[in-house]
Amino acid sequence: MEQDAEDIPVVYLHDIKRQYTQGEATLTILDGAKLALWAGQSVALVAPSGSGKSTLLHIAGLLEHPDEGEVYVGGAATSALTDAERTQIRRTDIGFVYQSHRLLPEFTALENVMMPQMIRGLKRSETVSRAKEILAYLGLADRITHRPAELSGGEQQRVAIARAVANAPRVLFADEPTGNLDPHTADHVFQALMQLVRATRVAMLIATHNMELAGRMDRRVSLENGVVVELE
């Protein structure tokens, strides 16, 4: 009997362990961590600096390998995949937003959003249409010809969000996406992210120190002694 796609997490981390060597010491960052991310659900990852938030995001997003455990994407295990296969999943199923927008300075907002689609091999006409649609949806229709230096901090982050969802990913990871923004601008960027979750049913995991924004998300989790714990 086939399992309904709605019953399968978009991403599931199972017994993830990750250690780093520092001199003669071994630091255990993740120690049996488990986490399920579901379609259309926003999850806040709230934990102190150095607790492993970025490591968890990188492993979940297939940017880093765990020492032990398994990452499932759409119900499929990824540990045995080649680097090329992992890269393909990142291009099609996963989007990333960082604290720094990481936009290419020589390209316009439109061109930055077109880039991941062109790398994927889509026709230019398709990439232009899709990029314009997303930028307009995020309130940037009149800024598409501007380069990053000509945009405000909030506009830069919204372009970064548009780029992250350009290939219609199934999951979006954001590492302190509002960390460099003032409270008013941070709220606008957060609303843009939540708007996309509701409209596209993408699963979203945000690492954040902003407890007010975290409180407006569907779930809140933290990291304690290398494991994921649910917060009230």
From Swiss-Prot:
Binding-site residues, ATP: 47-54
Membrane association type: Peripheral membrane protein
Residue ranges of domain ABC transporter in the record: 11-231
This protein's record includes keyword ATP-binding: yes
UniProt keyword Transmembrane present: no
Annotated keywords: ATP-binding, Cell inner membrane, Cell membrane, Membrane, Nucleotide-binding, Translocase, Transport
Places the protein is found: Cell inner membrane
GO terms assigned for molecular function: ATP binding; ATP hydrolysis activity; transmembrane transporter activity
Broad class of enzyme this protein falls into: translocase
GO BP term, example: protein localization to outer membrane
Gene Ontology CC annotations of this record: plasma membrane
InterPro entries, sorted: AAA+_ATPase, ABC_transporter-like_ATP-bd, ABC_transporter-like_CS, ABC_transpr_LolD-like, MacB-like_ATP-bd, P-loop_NTPase
Entry EC number(s): 7.6.2.-
Subunit structure: The complex is composed of two ATP-binding proteins (LolD) and two transmembrane proteins (LolC and LolE).
Similarity comment: family membership: Belongs to the ABC transporter superfamily. Lipoprotein translocase (TC 3.A.1.125) family.
Stored PANTHER family: IMPORT ATP-BINDING PROTEIN, LIPOPROTEIN-RELEASING SYSTEM ATP-BINDING PROTEIN LOLD
Function noted in UniProt: Part of the ABC transporter complex LolCDE involved in the translocation of mature outer membrane-directed lipoproteins, from the inner membrane to the periplasmic chaperone, LolA. Responsible for the formation of the LolA-lipoprotein complex in an ATP-dependent manner.
Entry protein name: Lipoprotein-releasing system ATP-binding protein LolD
GN (gene name): lolD
